[in-house]
């Protein structure tokens, strides 16, 4: 585990769940409440979903995140976590797929196959809630984050053919990271129902 991820996890460990996750959970009309929390980090979104009666299958590529969640959710029969990356995870059927700022780190050479797996796992009328990195983001050319995947707006829209997009927000501005570093953000936040 690198120092930068440890610092990030310490900064976000006590933060509440993301508002877009709550919005996505409220959109779900299916009786089956099964979620995948992809790149779950410290489990803040998983915690919220469990409180709403979901069964959560989570994964993260960083062992420290997995260990944090194993401790946090110890004994919860509705929670499972895997030490996996996007390309290695075995995707169960789900009604809600959460990828909060994690698909950024799916290597571009694996993304097409990963996206197929996500689409196959998400049942009809299931909800996707996640973020994709835009091509103007400063991480695209940075050595600090090799193997990231970035998209144009048109490419993101094409990914969601067969979905009803309910929320689409493009952020293209200077800002800071959770640990206070300045950077240029270019992201697409999407909430969509699979049709």
Where in the sequence are the language-model features?
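A short glycine-rich, Lys/Arg-flanked "PGG" loop and its adjoining helix->strand segment in the class I
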Residues: 112-124
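Short catalytic micro-motifs in class I SAM-dependent methyltransferases
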Residues: 101-102
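Class I (Rossmann-like) S-adenosyl-L-methionine-dependent methyltransferase catalytic domain
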Residues: 1-30, 41-90, 109-113, 127-195
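Conserved beta-strand/loop positions that form the S-adenosyl-L-methionine
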Residues: 38
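ABC ATPase nucleotide-binding domain "signature" loop
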Residues: 105
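A conserved beta-strand element that flanks and buttresses the S-adenosyl-L-methionine
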Residues: 98
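Conserved acidic residues
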Residues: 33, 95
